From Swiss-Prot:
Region (Disordered): 171-296
Biased composition (Basic and acidic residues): 282-296
Biased amino acid composition, Polar residues: 231-253
Keywords for this protein: Membrane, Transmembrane, Transmembrane helix
Segments traversing the membrane: 3-23
Organism lineage: Bacteria, Bacillati, Mycoplasmatota, Mycoplasmoidales, Mycoplasmoidaceae
Species of origin: Mycoplasma pneumoniae (strain ATCC 29342 / M129 / Subtype 1)
Annotated localization: Membrane
Full protein name: Uncharacterized protein MPN_491
One GO term describing the cellular component: membrane
Stretches assigned to coiled coil: none
Gene3D superfamilies: Endonuclease/exonuclease/phosphatase
Main location: membrane
InterPro entries: Endo/exonu/phosph_ase_sf (IPR036691)
Membrane topology according to the record: Single-pass membrane protein
Amino acid sequence: MKLTLWLVLGAVGVGAVGTGVGFGTKYFLDHKAKSNVDVAFKQRSLRKQVNVGFWNALNFLGSERSFGNQNSKVKTKGIAEIINLLKYDIVGLAEIQPSTESTAERFVDQLNEYADPYTSWSYDLSPVTTSKTASEGQKERILIVYNSQSVKMEGQGWFYDNPEMDISNYVSDGSSSKTRTPKKTKTSKKKPIKKKSSKSKSSKGSKKQKTTNESESETLELKLEQRRVTTRSQSKQQKGQEQATDQTDSEGVTTEEGADNTDTELVETTAETTEQEATTKSTKDTKETKDRTKVDWSRPPYSAEFSTQKGKVVVAFGHFDSPGANTKRGEKIAKMGKGQGAHEYFEAQTTFKAMDSIKQHFNNENILFMADTNIKFGNQAAAFGESKDYTFLTEDNEAWKSSLGTKSGYANPYDKIITSNSFKNKVLDQAETYWNYFDRYLKTKGHNSYLFDLASWGTKPRTISDHAPVGVLF
């Protein structure tokens, strides 16, 4: 079985070190070359290279029951094998279900089963994300796993303090744009069965009486059908209640590549969505329906400081609000338009401010920020703006599309890596030396950031995740 490693060429930041920016190219790495890869990464360790990654793992872990289901579908094994294949020193996993507790340790045990002699996995599980404006379905955790043989976590992890801010500056002035509405499960509508009347004398009556009987029959059948729908929904809700409370607010993916890159949100298997689908009466969460004037981050970034062979570095991992404006939650269209909602636009616009706070908290300028931003293809510059203090190590181009589409291939470059300018040169330092060990297999060198091509995985990619992992070397 072949795996594909998708890499981005060249240094990031034109003129920073006198090199240009290249584009992604696919390279194939067979399992037979694994021993050669192990040698290469052992050499990397000796040369003090550090490999940091991020991955939206798609509603991962959760309760013991949820973990068992994922394990039976090779999800946990696939994620564990890929993480070990990529030889991360540190990797942050997003969309970790809120009920995750003991299953985090079980997953790390599985990671260690696949580990080489130079790797011993440890982990830090964040608390559940907190927000004054996000829905219950958006809550999740971040799981940071790291190789304790190569790095050491210093102190405790930290959530960005997440202040509420006025959203009016980020909202559209009313110009037309597409909104995002949760997709509802199709319910088959059976035509009412008309009751046949007998031809006996006693059954003969006026046309009015016949019409009344048919009307009553239709009404009865409709009530029965409604009851069947409600019963099925309640059964589904009861059966999946454990999973329902686990799952987070999954963002949508482009349904037609090359169209307008407009995403439709995937159905959330939460109690709230189930009730909507069943059209039953429920008390709606005020956070979902209120007309928002202030917002905070739906899922504030979680960060931690590590001692490495290259010095101390702060890594921060995040997951922005779902793409588009969800009218069910009172969300607004972003001022920038282009299919973005005001909430994720607000998060993009305040990312550099959040990074400032994280640096200040740890008193460390060396920061790597990695997140599933839900900022669509072509929108990076308008969404984030420019900064004199920070640089993107990922680019807004075809090569960096990391979110899998529903039909084929990748749809959007949602997953971003940002670093402080003071740390940028350290990221680029010796990156070429590291990649020299792959010349025989990848036929190129000089890479410092990369994207793993999950679409080439041997099983259905979305069985594992709807995102590919990204990473950077320093």
